[in-house]
Structures are given as C-alpha cells and as structure tokens.
C-alpha cells in the first residue's frame, strides 16, 4: 500500500460522494450521539463566515430541528458562537452565514481582550509572543470560550475538521483542533462545497478563498499560500488521483510532520514518532 493509499484510508476519504447521502450521514451522526447521551442538551460551534463552519453549523441546526421534532424535547438547542478578534474584516460573511444557518441561539464573544491580557501576562513573565504564536493563542481562546458555553449549557463542542484540513494538520493543536465531535471528517474541500450547494447556501460563502486569518502581520493570509499547495491538489490527492511529484511530496511532508496533531497526547506505548 502506497503512502497515498494509507492516508486516504486513515482519513476515510472517498473519491466521489452523493451530497444528499453525506448530508444525511452527518445529521444522523449528530443525532445519534445526542440520543446516546440524553444529558446533553446543546451543540456549540464557532461561526467564522467561512465554508467549513457554515456547513457544520447548518448540519447542526438541521440535526437539532429533527431531534426536537422526533422527541418533543424543546430544551435541545444549537448555539452559534461569533468569536471576533476586535473587528472582523469579513463580518458581513459571518452575518450571511448566520442568516443561512438560522441557529436557535447566537452568542458573540470578542476574544481580543482575553488574548491581549494573556499576552501581557506572558510578557511580564519574560515571554514575548511572536505573531504566529499569538495566532495560536487566538484559536485556543476561541475554543476556551466555546467549552465554557458548552459547560454551562450541557453541550458538546462541534468541530469543522475535514480530510483536506486533517491531511496537512492545518489547525491549532488544542485550538480549533480540540473539539468533541467532527461531522465533516471524511470530506475533502470540494465535497464540502457540494454539500453546501445542495443545501442552498449562498455561493460567496463557499467560493471565497479559505483563510485562518490568525496572524496580525499577514491578515487574511489564504490557506493555500500558507500551505504551499492548492486545495484542488489536496482534493485530487485524497481522491486517489495522480498529482505532480512535488505536490505529493509537499502534502505527504505536511501529513507526516503533523501526525502528533491527529493523535491523543503521546505516551510510552506510542512509537509512530520513531518511524
């Protein structure tokens, strides 16, 4: 088995999908989890205005709507959380995503004050954060807020990780990578677009250039610029297609060096890092 085949198998990626079937699969997955643990009353997700959180948010609300109708339990809710750092450049996209999702509840937590306070405390301890590390601080503060909300609403934190993101480890460890449940896991980027199109999402929300937008020095830096490879290339690779040799090397290098991000904390029983 080639490394490409191993990666595809590990991430559960498929060369082709039926959008309606995958929508149903994700909704049923979320419903099944909540039914298994009836003490859970909410799904909590940060909404950025990008493709992934828009899709995950819509699926969450659909799952909650169905579960309420089936059980008569009106305490179930989907909580969409806006988490800007100061003023967000693409705020209108966030509002458009909220309008599309129609969440039960919308909370806004501006993380800038918390991030600056943490940065100042570290500075006083003799640690000056780089712009890159400050970006990770933002991602972790966003997740911290979501877990606080989930803790107060008997909820679970929903993630947006998918195969095209997992393969490169393009997420912050214990930031956006630290969630309870991931309904998009297995899909690549173009497949996520297919689901949103099937759901009637406004095109500009999934045709915009994806960006983590964490760095102050490089605002709205496109993911593809940071990765050095396009999502089309990544999706082709995940679909088992032949890609240029350098593209394959770039993708595989990202995969191998970020393996620790896709695993629980390393113990004495692990040896993947020795290979």
Swiss-Prot record:
EC number: 6.3.1.5
Signal peptide: none
Top-level class of the enzyme under EC nomenclature: ligase
A Gene Ontology biological process term: NAD biosynthetic process
Entry binding sites for ATP: 46-53, 160, 189, 211
UniProt keyword terms in alphabetical order: ATP-binding, Ligase, Magnesium, Metal-binding, NAD, Nucleotide-binding
Residues binding deamido-NAD(+), per UniProt: 140, 173, 180, 260-261
Tagged with keyword ATP-binding: yes
Name used for this protein in its record: NH(3)-dependent NAD(+) synthetase
Taxonomic lineage of the native organism: Bacteria, Pseudomonadati, Pseudomonadota, Gammaproteobacteria, Enterobacterales
């Amino acid at each position: 088995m080639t490394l490409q085949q191993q990666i595809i198998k590990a991430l559960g990626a498929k060369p082709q999908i039926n959008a309606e079937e995958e929508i149903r699969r994700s909704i049923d997955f979320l419903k099944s989890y909540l039914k298994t643990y009836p003490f859970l009353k909410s799904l909590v997700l940060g909404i950025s205005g990008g493709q992934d959180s828009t899709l995950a948010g819509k699926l969450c609300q659909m799952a909650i709507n169905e579960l309420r109708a089936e059980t008569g339990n009106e305490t179930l809710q989907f909580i969409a959380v806006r988490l800007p750092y100061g003023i967000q450049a693409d705020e209108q996209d966030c509002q458009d995503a909220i309008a599309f999702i129609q969440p039960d509840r919308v909370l806004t937590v501006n993380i800038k004050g918390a991030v600056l306070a943490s940065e100042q405390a570290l500075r006083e301890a003799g640690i000056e954060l780089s712009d890159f590390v400050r970006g990770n601080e933002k991602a972790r503060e966003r997740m911290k807020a979501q877990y606080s909300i989930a803790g107060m609403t008997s909820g679970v934190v929903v993630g947006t990780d998918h195969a095209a993101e997992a393969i490169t480890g393009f997420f912050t460890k214990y930031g956006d990578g630290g969630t309870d449940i991931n309904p998009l896991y297995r899909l690549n980027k173009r497949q996520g677009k297919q689901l949103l199109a099937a759901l009637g999402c406004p095109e500009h929300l999934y045709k915009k250039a994806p960006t983590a937008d964490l760095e102050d020095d490089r605002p709205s830096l496109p993911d593809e610029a940071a990765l050095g490879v396009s999502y089309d290339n990544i999706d082709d690779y995940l679909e088992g297609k032949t890609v240029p040799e350098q593209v394959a090397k770039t993708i595989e290098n990202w995969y191998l060096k970020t393996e620790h991000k896709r695993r629980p904390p390393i113990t004495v029983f692990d040896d993947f890092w020795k290979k």
